[in-house]
């Protein structure tokens, strides 16, 4: 290989490296598997330009296969009117007739991914060299990043990733086993610095300068799962003001593999094939969006949904300016689309109740430390840093008793870990099964029949039922209360400020009911590595229980209420907040800490429980349509949904956020009584009460962005499951402890959602449409926020979501280019 002295424009290469790294979306670990926009690194490009970029790099863009759209036209989901509007939207000169004619013609040239050198080797002998390279890198990454799953850990994990790989390659004999010679020697000749190695690799491969960006992006996407994990490590470091070079090092490893294969390849034909591939890329033309048939059809699909949504909103009741009487109760749920159904059901069984929608962390920006643990869990949107750390504590216990119970849990967890290590160790493989196998027969039978849970719920491991019932968040601060290793709780002087933030942004500043429920949400499943993806995204992939309980504790705190009153927020003395958890698998709501309620509210609580039970039944019956039990009696539907929480063979315990398509920030009266089919994120917001529009700014910079991430995660998992989804859930194997899953026993780390989360085996349940954001607020204020926040501006201006304004009179306007807001008819 050439020496560093021959490298020119090193700073330019460094910029190329950074650009490629920024294109990769982070992949959160299984312990808090939050949805993320897989195209987040392309948001600086207009949506259909990003489609062109992806078709050039991966061979697959942002649309479904043609037959999908043909089916939507055939069943009436896409109408003639939708097609006509889509042609105008895409500035196409075609008529609908010409479009339909073009649909019959398949593209003459298939979209070919941007090549890596292993592709040239594959083209020569048809052996899966790209898969071999990915397999070797994936095995290395699994060992390097392992979080305790491996019995024997890699000896070089303390070294930077690239330097550790150089040592690993000295011992890796797998290339020789498949007929590759000189690999170890070529790896040993690589420079020690990752950036220098990348520059040398590009020289070795003769990648033209104008293709460097594309090549580096393609190289990272070829190992995109582990690239996502490395990007996550970098994301976490950046939140702390630090840096992490794992992604850069992974890029170096990937391009160095290509350079090594090129250097050791003696076949002139393969090298010629490689240069021909690069030349083809330099002269490649991609269809314009206006001539891209599937882009027009995708736009028509989205227009069809918008037409239905806007019609529903226009027909809904308009918000009233009259003073609302005191509700019989108030219930705040997360904005999650699954809450839309149960809110609508609760309002049906109890017309006098008021429901609200707010992000499920309920405004408490914290990390939460489970009882007996030293490892905090984030309970806030992942785009924020937690200012507070709150510990789970044993109620009504002395310090000595608390320490005894904590030590007992830690001991149980250590014993369980040791026992599992013994059961899975090489020495006990046969003796353990022969000696104790029959003792597991009753549990195996019960688990197989779905009568028992295969394992305890993660939050209950090491706890007996009595201790579990006594656990609750500890509000009292130690230290300064800020998020650090030694300080916990929320200082009394800051509680009123936190309380004001909660109530103001929830839109709950007057007309308080006697009983106010804050209901977080979570899912209950077994044998589901990606189970936290069903929990609350606003709580960083945890259930909303802790967030709801700490918010309730704070708002019931006398000191907090005194401080709130000084700020002009007077909560009536007979108003009490209570925490709950909506199980989205069964639609049952558990209420916590009821012993703290005064006896004067016993009837209120009993009535609320009954309403929640009735609403849960209505919700289950509605969801049964998509679960195949719609024809069954209510009690049968309930039993089936409870079974899903225990059945280790159930690949579709619930549909989670499949179908999500809209985000609505408006007074509830705007959507009350409207069947939004569980497809809309609902955030209560009344701009008339938002002095300074700080709440509007929060909505557009946090919940709206998170909803876009969720929406695009589903979108990417559906339109390109191979790269941005996780394949077949049945084949998932956990790697690295809790890092992620492989499909089968090898290949790249998988990202996104499994096919079973999108398809019921016969038809697609999710519909890939970009998020439709509808906000009831002045256009000028929204424009001001868009101009101040580049992230929001990129999402709106580049078409990664649709933004609509709904006026006081119910008129709807769509934000288009040049800051124009044409009225929707």
UniProtKB/Swiss-Prot annotation:
Cofactor(s) needed, names only, are: Zn(2+)
Coiled-coil segments, which residues?
none
Indicate the quaternary assembly: Forms a complex with DabB.
| Keywords, sorted A to Z | Cell inner membrane, Cell membrane, Membrane, Metal-binding, Transport, Zinc
Q: What is this protein called?
A: Probable inorganic carbon transporter subunit DabA
Residues recorded as binding Zn(2+), renumbered to this chain, are: 334, 336, 521, 536
User: One GO cellular component from the entry?
Assistant: plasma membrane
Describe its function: Part of an energy-coupled inorganic carbon pump.
Family of the protein in this entry:
Belongs to the inorganic carbon transporter (TC 9.A.2) DabA family.
Where it mainly occurs, coarsely classed, is membrane
Q: Which PANTHER family match?
A: INORGANIC CARBON TRANSPORTER SUBUNIT DABA-RELATED, UPF0753 PROTEIN AQ_863
Q: Which domain of life is it from?
A: Bacteria
Q: What is the gene name?
A: dabA
A family per Pfam: DabA
Species name: Acidithiobacillus ferrooxidans (strain ATCC 53993 / BNL-5-31)
């Amino acid at each position: 290989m050439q020496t560093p002295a021959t490298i020119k424009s090193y700073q330019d290469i460094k910029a190329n490296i950074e650009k490629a790294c920024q294109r990769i979306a982070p992949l959160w670990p299984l312990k808090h598997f939050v949805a993320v926009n897989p195209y987040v690194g392309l948001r600086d490009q207009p949506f259909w330009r990003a489609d062109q970029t992806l078709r050039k790099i991966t061979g697959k863009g942002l649309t479904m296969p043609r037959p999908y759209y043909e089916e939507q036209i055939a069943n009436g989901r896409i109408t003639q009117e939708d097609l006509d509007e889509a042609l105008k939207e895409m500035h196409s000169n075609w008529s609908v007739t010409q479009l339909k004619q073009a649909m019959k013609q398949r593209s003459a040239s298939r979209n070919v991914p941007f090549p890596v050198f292993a592709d040239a080797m594959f083209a020569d002998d048809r052996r899966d060299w790209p898969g071999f390279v990915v397999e070797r890198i994936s095995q290395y990454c699994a060992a390097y990043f392992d979080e305790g799953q491996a019995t024997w850990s890699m000896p070089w994990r303390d070294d930077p990733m690239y330097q550790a790989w150089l040592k690993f390659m000295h011992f890796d004999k797998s290339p020789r086993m498949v007929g590759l010679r000189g690999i170890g020697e070529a790896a040993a000749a690589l420079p020690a610095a990752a950036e220098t190695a990348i520059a040398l690799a590009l020289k070795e491969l003769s990648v033209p300068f104008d293709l460097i960006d594309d090549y580096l992006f393609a190289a990272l996407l070829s190992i995109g799962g582990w690239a996502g994990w490395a990007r996550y490590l970098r994301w976490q470091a950046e939140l702390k003001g630090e840096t992490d070079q794992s992604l850069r090092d992974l890029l170096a490893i990937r391009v160095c593999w290509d350079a090594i294969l090129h250097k050791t390849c003696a076949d002139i034909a393969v090298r010629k094939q490689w240069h021909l591939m690069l030349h083809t890329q330099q002269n490649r033309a991609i269809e314009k969006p206006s001539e891209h048939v599937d882009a027009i059809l995708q736009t028509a699909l989205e227009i069809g949904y918008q037409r239905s949504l806007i019609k529903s909103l226009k027909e809904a009741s308009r918000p009233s300016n009259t003073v609302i009487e005191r509700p019989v109760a108030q219930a705040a749920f997360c904005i999650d689309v699954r809450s839309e159904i149960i809110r609508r059901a609760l309002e049906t069984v109890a017309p006098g109740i008021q429901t609200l929608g707010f992000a499920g962390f309920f405004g408490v920006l914290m990390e939460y430390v489970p009882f007996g643990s030293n490892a905090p869990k984030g309970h806030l949107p992942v785009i924020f840093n937690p200012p507070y750390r709150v510990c789970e504590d044993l109620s009504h216990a002395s310090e000595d008793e608390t320490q005894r119970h904590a030590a007992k849990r830690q001991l149980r967890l250590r014993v369980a870990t040791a026992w599992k290590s013994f059961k899975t160790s090489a020495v006990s493989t046969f003796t353990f099964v022969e000696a104790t196998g029959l003792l597991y027969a009753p549990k195996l039978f019960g688990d197989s029949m779905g009568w028992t849970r295969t394992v305890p719920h993660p939050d209950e491991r090491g706890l007996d039922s009595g201790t579990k019932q006594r656990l609750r968040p500890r509000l009292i601060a130690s230290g300064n209360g800020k998020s650090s290793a030694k300080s916990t709780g929320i200082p009394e002087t800051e509680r009123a400020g936190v309380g004001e933030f909660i109530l103001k942004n929830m839109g709950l500043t007057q007309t308080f009911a006697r009983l106010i429920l804050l209901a977080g949400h979570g899912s209950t499943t077994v044998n589901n590595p990606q189970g936290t993806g069903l929990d609350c995204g606003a709580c960083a992939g945890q259930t909303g229980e802790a967030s709801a309980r700490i918010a309730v504790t704070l708002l019931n705190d006398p000191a907090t209420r005194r401080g709130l009153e000084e700020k002009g927020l007077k909560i009536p003395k007979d108003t009490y907040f209570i925490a709950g958890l909506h199980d989205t698998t069964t639609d049952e709501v558990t209420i916590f800490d009821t012993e703290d309620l005064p006896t004067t509210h016993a009837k209120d609580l009993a009535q609320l429980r009954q309403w929640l039970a009735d609403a849960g039944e209505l919700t289950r019956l509605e969801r049964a349509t998509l679960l195949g039990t719609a024809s069954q009696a209510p009690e049968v539907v309930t039993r089936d949904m409870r079974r899903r929480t225990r059945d280790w063979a159930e690949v579709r315990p619930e549909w989670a956020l499949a179908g999500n398509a809209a985000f609505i920030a408006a007074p509830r009266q705007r959507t009350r009584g409207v069947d939004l089919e569980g497809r809309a994120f609902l955030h209560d917001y009344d701009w008339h009460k938002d002095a300074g529009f700080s709440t509007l700014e929060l909505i557009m910079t946090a919940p709206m962005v998170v909803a876009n991430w969720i929406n695009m995660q589903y979108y990417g998992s559906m339109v390109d499951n191979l790269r941005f989804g996780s394949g077949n859930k049945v084949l998932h194997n956990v790697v690295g402890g809790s890092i992620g899953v492989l499909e089968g026993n090898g290949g790249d780390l998988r990202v996104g959602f499994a096919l079973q989360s999108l398809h019921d085996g016969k038809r697609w349940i999710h519909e890939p449409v970009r998020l439709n954001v509808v906000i009831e607020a002045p256009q000028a204020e929204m424009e001001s926020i868009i101009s101040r926040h580049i992230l929001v501006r990129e999402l709106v201006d580049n078409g990664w979501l649709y933004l609509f304004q709904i006026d006081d009179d119910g008129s709807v306007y769509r934000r288009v280019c040049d800051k124009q807001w044409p009225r929707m008819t």
